[in-house]
């Protein structure tokens, strides 16, 4: 018996440990994706695995991206794992209304009682929305539902539950939802959340998501994949015949795998590079012997070696394949530039030597389809709600589709395991392996009205928060200090043209509650003088600062007609900003100047140029100058990079949806927050 590991390889029972199997199921899906990519010669793919409770996404470009730490239940484990991002959005994600917004998840209906359509008094879930819209067909599901487990999906109960929710929402908001438009609204919200997760493993790491093929699998993904591709601008989608059980397919394709790591932590030099060769041999030899003792042929055993490298003074290393010294060094620099946006400016150190040994197994061969068959005839037809209308679409059984068959959407394809919806702007082709390849006819722009509605309100809430989250990812990756990189003592947020807080990532509350005053102080001090490419620095507690070590970088965002439209800011705790004691938190200070340097409206970047000399003078021209200037400079540059990320992403939103729509929804989100707080206070008064 062989067991799957989070790293994407198999091991025996004696070698298996719990921490190495935490993500073994999703890892199987990733390995399945790699098999699909290689057989179709795709350059880069995004794995989109949507199941019942969550969605897992991954990326593959010929190399498996791995991490050395896995998180589960809030606990971090040091374990080699494939790089997989997860979002709580699946078929069981609960649908709700908070009085102003439609909500999808993160709670799940689970398998019992499950969604309303299971007939067990469950709550409305995403599966119910797909059923109402016709994206799944009850006649093709087994009769295993209801109390006696012999009933079909309960379509009437689902419609009744949606009818009740629709009436509640229309009464509360003055909207005019129909059953279909309400269900579609919930789907739109879920699709945006899943698309945002895909951005985390692509755009946030420097990869253009539009240059990838979307490999969709899991029971629910084929109903959503066209919408996800449209949101992200992805042109090509592939659905494997085993798409709903691709994790099992991947595990069947996985290889026996062993790995070993040795910590080194020394400067990367020609000498340390040569020393790593002997370390690699000492690590690999016992792993190869172990596989040979299991009966693996030595000809089928291969090894890969990697070095974990990092810039001196930083914590998180980047893993690069072992190669010639100069080639490997350039590879590290290229990855660093792609992820962080700049070249490493300090010395590089070798942290770990890694070895992976794999016994290549025979992969499952996808059967070739026979093209010498009659053209398929639609099994039946059904109605699906698409693009605001109900339209009739043909249903084809997957087994009837021959190699080379093509058809323009819309249509539905059903097999024993899943249902695929091909939307009108996609064309279908069946390749020789029976893989369903869909291509988007032209990249469509998703449009929204500037009028407030509960669906768009939640979508833009997630979009704005997603921008702040991407800023946080950039800041954590580029920072040098332990405070920001490891303790995560930072916050990122978006503000309207008046400096009012609009959206933030789930960062430090004390930062987020005060940052708006800092932004407003910058606005007041620079009214009519700010230009594109200007970034400002402030930490003054009398102007919204929390305490002096918390430095805030603020930048304006201008629209196409050079009108100041938004502000973006990041706040980070610096290890030292001067003062009478290291750390800038003296317990017996009598005046704020003894805590450190007060910064008020300092132009840190002018016209896109970092004012390093002026910044150093600011930090040193004091009775109690700042310590460790190099770290201060690098952390401020990281904050600037994060703010710049926010500016770029906001500009992308404006380009995609229009300036009027984006600014309107910034206003609506603030209105919604005020209304929600008012309702909460009224409820508190009534109850207490």
Named regions from a protein language model:
Residues 44-47, 54-104, 113-115, 240, ...:
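Glycine/threonine-rich beta-strand-loop-alpha-helix active-site module
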Residues 25, 62-63, 99, 313, ...:
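Residue-level detection of beta-strand-connecting loop/turn positions
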Residues 19-20, 63-66, 254-258:
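Short, hinge-like loop/turn segments at secondary-structure boundaries
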Residues 8-45, 67-82, 92, 197-206, ...:
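Conserved phosphate-binding catalytic cores of ATP/NTP-utilizing and phosphoryl-transfer enzymes
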Residues 5, 20-27, 49, 77-79, ...:
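Active-site nucleophile and cofactor-binding loops and adjacent substrate-binding regions
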Residues 3-9, 167-171:
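Active-site-adjacent bridging/hinge elements
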Residues 1-7, 61-71, 98-104, 187-200, ...:
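A short, flexible low-complexity segment enriched in Lys/Arg and Gly/Pro that occurs
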